[in-house]
Amino acid sequence: VIVFAALGLGATGTNGASATETWIHPVLPESVVKAAPAARRGGRAARPAAPARPAPFPTAVSGDTSFVEVTTGESYPEPSSAVPPEKIERSFARLGEGRPMPLTGARVDGPLTRLEATWLGQGLATLGLLLVPEGRTVEAAAFETFLRESGAREALALRAKKKETKKPARIVTIESARAFAGVVAPPRAKRTADPAAGRDEALGLPLELVAGGSPLTLRAGDVLTTTLLLDGRPLAGALVRALAPGAEAALEAETDAHGTASIPLEREGRLLLLAASVRRTEK
């Protein structure tokens, strides 16, 4: 059984035992300047409203509805193929410790699967996606490569001990993905929470990466700390990879005894964190 987790920063999950990843991304509107109202007879045209200073992270307005995209691809963040809606077991958004709000209306649109999110409340929203477990057979060479790249040393050693390195592997994968958005107050409404002050919380996914500190305010030059949880408990000795658009190679870090990994952020923009846990089951 292979459990996958992904965490998207700047809005972003993983497949595995292959060269593809699955990620989730909230599509949020950009700030625009409203047109000036028409001039009254004999009067001067009103000055256009000054554009609101855009937040340095994805934001949605409380009460609005927007799209959330799910896709898979071999070259993040370029989409390759949609995730069939019937393969989505759970999809939701949660603010703080509030009740998860389901993402609805899943439909395929070319290489993307689009869902709708209605943003309620204010603060840091965490998007969660869990796919239906999937069984398949992976050729020996591809599976050995996957185990090496994911840092599954114990699984590699056990296959070698059992002389299985040239045998195909029958696997069951469980995939999940997470991403963030800031939910802000509507115009002229009272602000009750600051998304930038929000802290990431575990969603209860089988395997998940939980960001340390405020995930929305990270910048190039910062060091991102993230804790990998397997069934809610810290997982030590696991490899965490970070993919950035345009980067030649993924950054890698190993979780310590507390399940925490530290990754230096070298550039601005989106980032996809990936991790996997491999567990052998008896027939």
Spans of features found by a protein language model:
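Bacterial N-terminal signal peptides
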Residues: 1-10
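Beta-strand-rich domain onsets/edges
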Residues: 16-47, 52-67, 154-224, 229-236, ...
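Short amphipathic, basic-aromatic surface patches that mediate peripheral association
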Residues: 72-81
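Short, ordered, surface-exposed loop/turn motifs in non-cytosolic proteins
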Residues: 84-86, 232-243
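Short amphipathic beta-strand segments in non-cytosolic proteins
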Residues: 89-99, 239-253
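Short beta-strand segments within Ig-like beta-sandwich modules, predominantly Fibronectin type-III
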Residues: 103-108, 252-256
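Glycine-centered loop-to-beta-strand initiation motif
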Residues: 111-113, 121, 255-269
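Short acidic/polar inter-strand loop motif in beta-rich domains
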Residues: 132-140, 279-283
